[in-house]
Amino acid sequence: MHGVTVDITRTGWATSATTDGAILGRVDTLAPSCGLRLLPPRPLRASDDATLFMRHVQEHDGLAGYLLMGAGTYGPHHSPTFDLDEAVLTPAADLLATLIRSLEDP
């Protein structure tokens, strides 16, 4: 229409990942004891480094999961105004420690 052309050169990429059901089941069971609750899972479309690790683990018959802890919305990520409610840190650490211990003793 305006004589414009474009060339696209792929210089990078990112993937997505999904937390394994076995991990979700354990988190759903353990979260209330840590004062937390599990929201319905969604595919992870962020943290491309974490999704690559997760895919690698899953491709080698391991279980992988990625948990986001609700900590308020005080400015966009990676900005000078970003902040979080630090009250979530202790329950989140408790959940991760409890999850790890539960995986050690299937």
Give the ranges of each region predicted by the language model.
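Metal-dependent amide/peptide-bond hydrolase catalytic core
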Residues: M1-P106
